[in-house]
Amino acid sequence: MSERKLFTSESVSEGHPDKIADQISDAILDAILAKDPEAHVAAETAVYTGSVHVFGEISTNAYVDINRVVRDTIAEIGYTNTEYGFSAETVGVHPSLVEQSPDIAQGVNEALEVRGNADQDPLDLIGAGDQGLMFGFAVDETEELMPLPIALSHKLVRRLAELRKSGEISYLRPDAKSQVTVEYDENDRPVRVDTVVISTQHDPEVTNEQIHQDVIDKVIKEVIPSSYLDDKTKFFINPTGRFVIGGPQGDSGLTGRKIIVDTYGGYSRHGGGAFSGKDATKVDRSASYAARYIAKNIVAADLAKKAEVQLAYAIGVAQPVSVRIDTFGTGTVAESQLEKAARQIFDLRPAGIIQMLDLKRPIYRQTSAYGHMGRTDIDLPWERLDKVDALKEAVK
């Protein structure tokens, strides 16, 4: 009998407390970048019942009304009713932002490669904002070259938000979570969905039976292709039996606590650094995007069925200290060839990544819910497939 395996990933909605924090941090980043593209930003957010704290380090000459940005973001998510215990107009907003450390700034603003050498390449000027390792990944399981479990998990909670905001399911509230377990065959190909878990916040009057039926009919069956569902697929809808108290009233939230949701759902490794609230000189963010860009173009070029790219940096140094590509035995060329090609085709210095992906723009708020990778609903530069031909040519 052939061996089959299960793999599970989860996602959370824009109304989840940690995601509220991520969206506020990225909304602040975007507001600053819109006025000052050269700004350095590290904005952290904590949310809980009736209160938002924004703290961190910023270097900019621009003025941004933090209070207004916070309230507008909360309102856009859907927290506009005081019954939710967290409302855009009544929440207390407490900003505490200071200037970036000059010790860090000197390494970012003048990389090791250019110190004492005025003739260096200007793209060597910016050093990495910190040491660290970052991963990017792609696999040919979906059209967007993402693992199927996380792709479906994101689509489920996004569908819930659409139904809530349109009023089609009027009893839905903003907080929600999804989890999808996919069965893989002996060739590591997805063959069916084994389990779907959805927990969604709701008004107190609605029955569990109504929620169960609506979620199956209007969410699950609208999102998951019927070819993946069968009579053995298990559905757990609000398995606690009640989810009225949610959002920051039910649980505190912090920026950067959903890094696996933000990336590949645990299917690929993660370097540990969060994204939201950070400008592109922070390689936690920009190099993760670059690594995804490389991996996606490798798979799209049919040079591997799956590819994981690791980049690593030293603080204040422009060039990465290592580039590693793993194709898990699915590659059509040697991994060393792919690593050499990646270094040739993709400029992996922080300033090179920023230029290559045009990262000084206010594009980050839209990434802060429903995943930073594999998005088909928005145009993100690291999702483009414009390096396929160059990669094919480089490994001939």
Swiss-Prot record:
HAMAP family: S_AdoMet_synth1 (MF_00086). Binds 2 divalent ions per subunit. It comes from Streptococcus pneumoniae (strain 70585). K(+) binds at residue 44. Keywords: ATP-binding, Cytoplasm, Magnesium, Metal-binding, Nucleotide-binding, One-carbon metabolism, Potassium, Transferase. Pathway: Amino-acid biosynthesis; S-adenosyl-L-methionine biosynthesis; S-adenosyl-L-methionine from L-methionine: step 1/1. It comes from the Bacteria. Signal peptide: none annotated. Mg(2+) binds at residue 18. It is an enzyme of class 2 (transferase). This is S-adenosylmethionine synthase.
